[in-house]
Amino acid sequence: MHYKARDVFAPIGLNVYKENDNLDIYIMSDKLTDANNLTLQVSLIDFKGEVIKSTQTKVTAKANVSEKVLSLSVKDYVTEEQQGNSVVKVELVDNKNNTIAHSNYFFHWPNKLNLPQTNIEQSTTYADGKYTITLKSNYLAKDVFVEIPIQGAQFNDNFFDLLPSEKKVITITSPELLKSAKTPFTIKHLRETYK
């Protein structure tokens, strides 16, 4: 839960909201000055990684305000079938292509999505006090959860969506983590819980 709260309290954030027949994208800024020269990248991606549609729009994150910057007609943007098999990936990037904020929007609750079976590839670097795990999946892995049997271990992120072919780096820190011990951890995603 606190991983989502971190995103909510970031100085600049994105919110994707479906109202009536529109998909509205908002930029929320707590900064006291405008952030200019930003690009809003919006992509419709199926769960196997095919980019169905992609658009880019120049935007400004106005100071200390929440503002709708894009509105898409759902019926013109995505078919009924695609709604159960795709995600809208929204990113706000600066002029150096650094991601300022991101958000993934699913048209249905997870139990109504056609989540694919997938395996998450991982590579791990072990150091005393810190494990660094790089994750990648060919298909969408929804609600990925990493767990390690050490009380109080700190994660830089957890319980996230791993989009097809994207890499995600997770760091786990704790004084109890030893390079030589290679303490085992588990990685699960929502589709693995289906029977």
Where are these regions (language model features)?
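Extracellular/lumenal ectodomain signal focusing on beta-strand-rich modules
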Residues: 143, 184-187
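Enriched for extracellular/lumenal, surface-exposed ectodomains of secreted and cell-surface proteins
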Residues: 90-97, 187-195
